[in-house]
């Protein structure tokens, strides 16, 4: 499903034509929006979000966030009952998600944070599984 501004951009005909690369980038951005990742709510909101360079940088930043070491560190700190380090990791992940306009993780992050505060390893791991499943889906659609 494409959002209206992307449909408008994709349907431009005549003297202005989009490159194949721009079409692929627009499709990736539209897929990201389906997962609650919106470039217009990110640190790029003041830039021309239909610019090929801006879209490329944004997609690269989202991809890097999805595979960043902080997710692995969070899992390790929870498994080792290092609650203070886990709390720091979840705060850093949430801050980075907010910068990139990734809203789909906030509910899960709140669940992980609550489990960390209660020192409930089982609940924290269950919430982390939800986050990891979402990450896998997002990365699959990003190509």
Predicted regions located by residue number:
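Two-component system phosphorelay core
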Residues: 1-88, 92-94, 98-143
């Amino acid at each position: 499903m494409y959002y209206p501004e992307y449909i408008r951009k994709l349907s431009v005909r005549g003297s202005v034509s989009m490159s194949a690369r721009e079409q692929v980038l627009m499709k990736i951005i539209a897929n990201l929006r389906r997962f609650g990742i919106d470039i217009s709510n990110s640190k790029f909101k003041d830039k021309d979000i239909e610019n090929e360079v801006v879209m490329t940088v944004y997609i690269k930043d989202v991809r890097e966030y999805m595979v960043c070491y902080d997710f692995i560190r969070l899992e390790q700190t929870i498994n080792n009952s290092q609650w203070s380090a886990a709390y720091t990791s979840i705060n850093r992940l949430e801050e980075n998600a907010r910068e990139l306009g990734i809203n789909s993780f906030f509910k899960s992050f709140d669940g992980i944070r609550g489990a960390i505060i209660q020192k409930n390893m089982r609940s924290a791991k269950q919430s982390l599984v939800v986050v990891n499943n979402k990450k896998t889906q997002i990365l699959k659609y990003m190509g």
